[in-house]
Every structure is written in C-alpha cells, then in structure tokens.
C-alpha cells in the first residue's frame, strides 16, 4: 500500500539565499615588476630602540639659534683674519730679513696646519661612523630584495673594511657557496651566516672578558672611586675594541658620539629587557642570600658592561640581526656567575691551606 501524502507546509518568510563571495579580478605582473617584488612583512614590529634613540637625539640636539649663527660667523671671520695677518707678517719678515719673526710665522703655520689636519681627521672618522648606519640600512634593503648585481660588491666591501683577508677560510667558503644565479638577498644572507659570525665571535669574547674583569674588580675592591674609574676606563676600551673589530676607526668626537648613542639606547630600550632577563632570574635563584653584597655589586657591574658591549656591537655591526643571532644578556649572566663562584671558592680554600 502506498503511504498517504503529507500535507503542505507554508512558511511565514521566504527562504534566504546565502551570499556567495565574489572572486577578485585576475592581476598580472610584468617581468620588471616581478623582479622588484618583495613580500610584505605583516608581523613586522617597529624598532622601538631606534625611535627612542631618534627622539632623545632630537631633544638633546641644540637648536640653530641666531646667537649660535652669529658666534660661528664671528669665529670664522676671526680665523680668516688670523690667517691673513699671518701671511702679511710672513711677507714683511721676508722683505726685512727678520729671521726670528719668520721662524715664529713658520711655527705658527705648522701649528695651524696640525690643527686643521686633526679637525679633518676627526670629521672623517665621525663621517665613517655615520656611514655605518647607512650601510646597515642598505644591508636591510638587500636582505629583502630580489634584484641581482649589488650583493656581492657590498659584501666584499664589508670584508675589506673589517680587514678580512681574501685567503680567510670563512670568506673562501662564502665564495664557494655563491653563484651567478643567486639574487642579492641570498648572497647577503650567505655572508651573514658564513663570514659575519667570525667577527661576532671575536666581539663576544671581548665582551665576556671585559665583563668578567669588571665583575671581579668590583667584587674584590673596596674603594668606590677606584671602582668607578676602572669601570669607566674599561668600558671605553671595550667600545674601542668592538669598533676596531668591525673596521671603524674612532676619533675623539666619534668615540663620544658612539658612547652617547650606546648610553641612550641602554637608558630607553634596555631597562625593560634588563629587568626581564635579570630580575626574575635573580629572584628565583635568591642570589642575594648566596652571595655577598660586594659580589652582587660585581655581578651588576659586569652585566652593565656586557649590556654596553652588546649595544656597541649592534651600532658598529654592518648587518642587522637576523635569525635571532643577537647575543643575549642571559648567556653572559650565567658565565659571570660561574666565574665569580669559582673565584670565591678559590679565595675561601686558599686560607685553609
């Protein structure tokens, strides 16, 4: 038997059709556009350290006021007058055969020439330090570029500036790994993984040595003024050593500028990182109960020296940090604690013998 038909069901509202997503039109790129195409970094975060450093540098930079321009103009006019008067004195001494005055003019000319030469040398070294920041920006662009032809020359220039010989094993491995079909991003990336770690390892060893010396000096010494002078002197030497390793010759003003940039970077960007990496670990291990007050102060001084070296390394390095290869403060912290414990154990065991 057939089943009876079900009655019709009427709905109050008509059925709603689900909206379908419309497809976008096809986009085609030319060959020239495909070469310069670079993927956008969605999760890329702005560099807080650079923003803070630029803000403070702009705040501390003196404004070009009218009085400053008048003073600079007066100094320039005075210098020109001194040079003109010196030329006139020299001519008069030569005409009157006053050899004593002529010798004084010659000595003054030598002093002025030495002063001008030192100013030019300082300016050139300061310009070289500023160029390192531009080279780092250029390297960052090459690491995101798909073009061909600039990466090899750029890396060879960096190797020459750092004093790396052509027969160096790391540079030979880099030459063997690159070929003509690779773009600039791949060539610079290979240089960053094969050649740059050689210089970074030397800089890490220098930071470890200077931080250990600062830690032991503060932990052993009991004179605050001597400690402060020693730490300041060693920190300046550390900055000079790191700059020399990366091929930067520092003068007086360039050294002050680098030291100022490092301190500003530490003050604005390093405080939170220092608390995060050091404070929680110290609280968890209760180092204050295990070590003496002088030892704790020594560890703090060593960590600040290590932090100073890391930031100097970052400012002198020609390439940006990639693949989390930036040295961490925790690595130096564990090393400093181990060295300090060994020193304290040796000092305690020596009187017993």
UniProtKB/Swiss-Prot annotation:
Signal peptide positions on this chain: none
Record's subcellular location: Cell inner membrane
Disulphide-bonded residues: none
UniProt GO cellular component terms: plasma membrane
Statement: the UniProt record of this protein carries the keyword Glycoprotein: no
Region entry Disordered, spans: 1-35
TM helices/strands, residue ranges: 70-90, 100-120, 213-233
This protein's record includes keyword Transport: no
A Pfam family of this chain: DUF697
Topology of the protein relative to the lipid bilayer: Multi-pass membrane protein
Swiss-Prot/TrEMBL keywords: Cell inner membrane, Cell membrane, Membrane, Transmembrane, Transmembrane helix
Coiled-coil parts of chain: none
Composition bias, Basic and acidic residues: 1-19
Family named by the database record: Belongs to the UPF0283 family.
HAMAP family in the cross-refs: UPF0283
Protein's UniProt name: UPF0283 membrane protein YcjF
Organism the protein comes from: Salmonella enteritidis PT4 (strain P125109)
Lineage summary: Bacteria, Pseudomonadati, Pseudomonadota, Gammaproteobacteria, Enterobacterales
